[in-house]
Structure formats: structure tokens, C-alpha cells
Design a protein with these regions (language model features):
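PRPP-associated nucleotide enzymes
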Residues: 1-218
Length: 218
């Protein structure tokens, strides 16, 4: 963790996870589940789940990008539901095409990361959704919308860094948004990490396997 002249920066996602875990300790005695947004949220969630002693799963939702800029989220989809922020220049045909593409990918992810494991029962539990950062918040809005259908006791969104606008948006939907950094000027999630390389599927499996081993040994 270093300070430069303009930005507080996390060394990597693991350090960010340690700092976030310290802010989430108050939930340690709750019946809870950590849900990691793949792939970048998994190393962060690894440290949080270790600290809290919660089981961890990947959140099987995926953003739907704007047709002219795929990185700009206009909504999100799960295998059974979806959420879209209306845009005048986004057609229903485009949305349906994206839903088909996204759900095909989600099915592959479910098999790869979770195999034949039954999803955790979220009813009445404190559900902590972890990502490596939030820019617009639109993807997580969709995730929260889907999770509500499982009747959790509480939904907490935990991230190392988030834009002010995203925190305001998500605070209306989640029960709490916990962020290590909410900078006055937001330059994109990656700007607040020294190491922000993409997380591979192999790394996701590594962290999920390590957490399973820790829980089995406990």
C-alpha cells in the first residue's frame, strides 16, 4: 500500500481484501455468506471470507454493456432474471441478443467454478457481495435485484474503492455499502491499484479451493 501525490493505491486485490475485511468485521457473528463477483472480486472476497469465516460463492450475474461501449454497464443478467437501466439508444433486440450471449457464458461459469455444488441458501442470512471496485454501479444493481428474490436478511455490498455516484445509487438498493475508499475524484477502478492485472479462471479456482480447504479443516 503506497501513497503517491494524487492517489491512495492498493498494492493488489489481496491487500485491498485485507483492508476491506477489517471494515466488515462487525458482521462476523452473523449467519452469513460471501458472494464474489468474478473474476476480480474473488481475491478480494478470499480475504474477507477468511476473516469472517463465511462460505464463499461466485455471483452468477454478468453485466450487459452498452452497444457503443461494452465496458459501460447498462444492466446485468443472471441465469433466471435481468435488470436494465433504460436507454433511448438501446433496442429490445440488442437486449435479447445480449441476454442469450450472457446466459450462455454464465452456464459455463457455473459448471467451471461451482461444479455440481448446490448454491448456498441465502434466506435470512447476511449476504456480503464483494467486487474489486465499483464505477457505475449498474452491474451490482442488477445483482442486488436478483439476490432480493432469495429473501436474504441483509445485503451488504463491500468493495475496496467506489465512485461517489455508485455508492449513492447502491445505497438505495442494498442495506449497506462498505468501501475502503470513496475518492472525491474517480479515475476508474484500476487507477487505485498498483497491480490490476486480469484474474484468470485458474486463479479463481485456486482461491475458491483454498477457502473450501480452510472450512473443511475448521
Amino acid at each position: 500500500m503506497k501513497n503517491n501525490k494524487t492517489l491512495f493505491m492498493f498494492r493488489d486485490r489481496l491487500e485491498a481484501g485485507l483492508l476491506l475485511a477489517a471494515k466488515l468485521k462487525k458482521y462476523k457473528n452473523d449467519p452469513g455468506v460471501v458472494l464474489a463477483v468474478p473474476r476480480g472480486g474473488v481475491p478480494v472476497a478470499y480475504e474477507v471470507a477468511k476473516e469472517l469465516g463465511f462460505p464463499v460463492e461466485v455471483v452468477l450475474t454478468k453485466k450487459i454493456g452498452h452497444p457503443t461501449n461494452k465496458e459501460y454497464a447498462i444492466g446485468a443478467a443472471s441465469l433466471s432474471d435481468y435488470f436494465i437501466v433504460p436507454h433511448a439508444d438501446v433496442t429490445e433486440e440488442y437486449i435479447q441478443q445480449e441476454l442469450q450471449r450472457v446466459r450462455s457464458r454464465l452456464k459455463e461459469m457455473y459448471i467451471r467454478f461451482m461444479g455440481d455444488k448446490e448454491p448456498e441458501n441465502l434466506k435470512g442470512k447476511t449476504v456480503i457481495v464483494i467486487d474489486d471496485g465499483i464505477a457505475t454501479g449498474n452491474t451490482l444493481l442488477g445483482t442486488v435485484n436478483v439476490l432480493r428474490k432469495n429473501n436474504p436478511g441483509k445485503i451488504v455490498i463491500g468493495v475496496p474503492v467506489a465512485s461517489k455516484s455508485a455508492v449513492q445509487k447502491l445505497s438505495k438498493e442494498g442495506d449497506e455499502v462498505v468501501a475502503v475508499l470513496i475518492p472525491e475524484e474517480f479515475y476508474g477502478v484500476g487507477a487505485f491499484y498498483e497491480d490490476f492485472k486480469q484474474v484468470s479462471d485458474e486463479e479463481v479456482m485456486f482461491y475458491l479451493d483454498k477457502l473450501r480447504e480452510l472450512r473443511e479443516a475448521a
